[in-house]
């Protein structure tokens, strides 16, 4: 099978790290409770049922909130924990700074395929090559957007993502 490769940045609509939990806490009329997703809350591609609860400023929520179909990956873990946040329903989750939240252009890429690729040995090797730093190698959004990834047809992506 001959698969095209694309610049990862070309299929990303939004990307970013989270903030420290203390950065969300504010005392005004816009504060609401939500869950805070940390690296330890991800196990074998699944988000824990009960993440810690914090209070956040709802005016700032959208920038850091996990949305349906977002791909979440770790920045420092050598094994790169990766998940696809399917249907979030009413669950409100914010990401910590040790995670990157990627909102994809779903017309171009299937989130489950991207999560499956990034979880594969080939994908982890690609992610490792995108990291920077001499002592603590960290994955940054800029480097990630510049990586090349294989992108089969949408039909093939869906087949792979469903496995």
Question: Where are the regions that the model predicts?
Answer:
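A short glycine-rich beta-alpha junction/loop motif
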Residues: 93-98, 132-158
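Non-catalytic DNA-recognition/assembly elements of restriction-modification systems
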Residues: 1-21, 150-163
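Membrane-cytosol interface segments
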Residues: 31-33
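Short, positively charged
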Residues: 110-140
């Amino acid at each position: 099978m001959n698969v095209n490769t694309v610049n990862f940045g070309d299929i990303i609509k939004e990307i970013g790290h989270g903030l420290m939990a203390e950065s969300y806490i504010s005392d005004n009329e816009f504060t609401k409770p939500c869950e805070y997703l940390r690296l330890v809350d991800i196990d074998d591609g699944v988000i824990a049922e009960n993440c810690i609860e914090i209070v956040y400023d709802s005016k700032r929520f959208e920038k850091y909130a996990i949305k349906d179909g977002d791909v979440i990956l770790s920045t420092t873990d050598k094994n790169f924990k990766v998940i696809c946040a399917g249907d979030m329903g009413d669950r409100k989750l914010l990401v910590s700074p040790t995670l990157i939240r990627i909102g994809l252009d779903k017309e171009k890429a299937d989130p489950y395929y991207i999560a499956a690729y990034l979880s594969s040995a080939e994908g982890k090797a690609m992610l490792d090559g995108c990291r920077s730093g001499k002592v603590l190698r960290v994955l940054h959004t800029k480097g990630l957007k510049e990586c090349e990834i294989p992108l089969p047809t949408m039909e093939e992506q869906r087949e792979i993502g469903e496995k």
